[in-house]
Amino acid sequence: MEIREFADMDKFEDIMNNWAKATGLATVAVGADGKYISGCYNFTDFCIKLTRGSKEGCRRCEKCDREGKGVYHCHAGLIDFGIDLVVEGQKVGSVIGGQVLPEHPDEEKFRKVARELGINEDKYIEALKKVNVRTEESINASAMLLGQVLNNFINAEYSKKINGSIIGSLTDGVNAANHLVEEIKKKTGELRSIQSKQKILAL
């Protein structure tokens, strides 16, 4: 089951975009296979251009994307989150994001990360200074809110599609029954006509 098969993705992405603007956090949705199914909202240069721009950094980021649950510290020292998207007990994807700091950073710690990833230290620190700072409590509340809203939305979309299919099937059934009734009436009329002719001939 894929979200794009039953959900209005324009509305889905509107929710994500508005949430990202309101909270200052980054977010993206992935399918059950881990591949992106939405745009990337509010992504920082620190993450998308520098950390993910290095081979080792990208490998570590993808590992966090796959394995991160709830609110957690990513390999580069930022706070990220991963919330499952579930329909009828089946995981159909995840919404991931964050890319914020829980406190003002220790530059030396991040210079060490830059060296490990083969990234220019000064550029890394310059990008780091543009990363938003949020308390873990507010990050957790924001992540849970997005997860709840998206889960409610996709479940409503799924129910609408399923109910629409049921109604469509019932309508088809009613139409078929009406057609059958009309055919029976027609055949009955033809039979009565034949019977009348037979009576006349019998006279």
What are these regions (language model features)?
Residues 1-77:
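Structured interaction and signal-relay segments at domain junctions
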Residues 11, 59-60, 109, 123, ...:
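Exposed alpha-helical structural elements
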Residues 62-115, 130-145, 149-153:
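Sensory/regulatory domains in signal-transduction proteins
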Residues 115-126:
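A short, charged helix-loop
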Residues 130-203:
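Signal-transducing coiled-coil/dimerization helices and immediately adjacent hinge/linker segments
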